[in-house]
From Swiss-Prot:
Protein name per UniProt: Large ribosomal subunit protein uL16
Assembly notes: Part of the 50S ribosomal subunit.
Gene Ontology process terms (BP): translation
Gene, per the UniProt record: rplP
Organism: Shewanella halifaxensis (strain HAW-EB4)
PROSITE patterns: RIBOSOMAL_L16_1, RIBOSOMAL_L16_2
Annotated Pfam families: Ribosomal_L16
Length: 136
């Protein structure tokens, strides 16, 4: 699972997921999976989508993960009274804005890449779209 090796502070405020995305262009591979909606991806979802793609392309080509879960999400145990401090870190998420490229792929045909990204998109809680690299 993806998570930071070390952080200055263990716990983080909830914050808001507003604004525009960085990393909106396909830069490493030929094809990409771009987020249309706004939300957050957990480390488990990122890994599940990566596995689905890797299995479908049968380890040919190359896959880049363009997102990293760097925000800790805490929760208190069940049946615990309010107060007594913030809960423990349960999992890590990455906040996604519309237009962010989530995954990139190279070395496979467009048809195979489309199928692989469709399988990956089924594992994600966001609406996504298939994009290709634009040559300037």
């Amino acid at each position: 699972m993806l998570q930071p090796k070390r952080m200055k502070f263990r716990k983080m405020f909830k914050g808001r997921n507003r604004g525009l995305a960085n990393g909106t262009e396909v830069s490493f591979g030929e094809f990409g999976l771009k987020a249309v909606g706004r939300g957050r991806l957990t480390a488990r979802q990122i890994e599940a989508a990566r596995r689905a793609m890797t299995r479908h392309i049968k380890r040919q080509g190359q896959i880049w993960i363009r997102v990293f879960p760097d925000k800790p999400i805490t929760s208190k145990p069940l049946e615990v009274r309010m107060g007594k401090g913030k809960g423990n870190v349960e999992y890590w998420v990455c906040q996604i804005q519309p237009g962010k490229v989530l995954y990139e792929m190279n070395g496979v045909s467009e048809e195979l890449a489309r199928e692989a990204f469709t399988l990956a998109a089924a594992k994600l809680p966001l609406k996504t779209t298939f994009v290709t690299k634009t040559v300037m």
